[in-house]
Amino acid sequence: MGDSLFLTGADLAALAFFLAVWLVHGLAADGKLVGRMSLTTAMNAQREAWMRTMAQRELRMIDTSIMVGLQQGTAFFASSSLLALGGCFALLGASNDVLSVLSDLPLADAPPRQVFEIKVLGLMALLAYAFFKFGWSYRLFNYCSILIGAVPMHKEGSAAPAAMEAAIGRATRMNVLAGRHFNAGLRGVFFSLGYLGWFVGPEAFALTTTLLFAVLLRRQFFSAARLAVIDESAQAGPGNGSSIRPDSQ
């Protein structure tokens, strides 16, 4: 690689491939690209089933515990993304040491320092994106907790079924939307792992992106987890004809 500040054609092609794969995976996971149900859309149907079951319970401590678990998991990933982002700042300060290590690898020549720093900035952008997605998801789960509290008790809902249905719909849509942003943040973390291949070279970047894409597709469409969730009710869930499918992010 030359001493230019600009990325090579191979670098740009690998980066474009990476972004295209990210976009395709996101659309496929949300049920907007292929007819086969993904694990994400199947779980969205289960979120709706959860809200309907919750509305039938007089005591909702189990639902509160589930929400706490979702919030804690989201907070963990948000904190981890922030720590990784701080590590990238340290990486920028140790650029010479990292380039020395890369120069010893037989796979590719070490890039110029300026190009290396551009790649680190790209990694920081990925982690910042993931952090903001996790942060917003955490807040949406908070909102969902409030909406769950606003769902009438079963006896009251029986007297006003329309109000009960509207409250269930609000809680479901908020829960699905919170899950969507959490999945987007998780996708950013996963793809940041594939992004690491770019520090070796554009060929390695394309290879790690392809391998990551294959793993994520298998989990979404061909995994045991998907088979455990899929049933007739899920076939009508969000992303496959259900009215509970928020389009805005």
Predicted regions and their residues:
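Juxtamembrane "helix exit" motif at the C-terminal ends of alpha-helical transmembrane segments
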Residues: M1-D3, L82-D109, G197-A206, L212-L217
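Cytosolic juxtamembrane amphipathic/interface segments immediately preceding
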Residues: G2-D3, M54-L70, I168-V176
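Hydrophobic alpha-helical transmembrane segments
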Residues: L5-A16, L107-G122, P202-L207
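Hydrophobic alpha-helical membrane-embedded segments
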Residues: D11-L39, A75-F89, V120-N142, V189-F190
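Membrane-interface amphipathic/juxtamembrane segments adjacent to transmembrane helices
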Residues: A29-M67
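Transmembrane alpha-helical segments and their cytosolic interface motifs
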Residues: D63-F89, F116, V120, K133, ...
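Alpha-helical transmembrane segments of helical membrane proteins, especially in multi-pass transport
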Residues: Y129-W198
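Cytosolic/matrix-facing juxtamembrane and C-terminal tails of multi-pass cellular membrane proteins
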Residues: G149-G157, A163-T172, R219-Q249
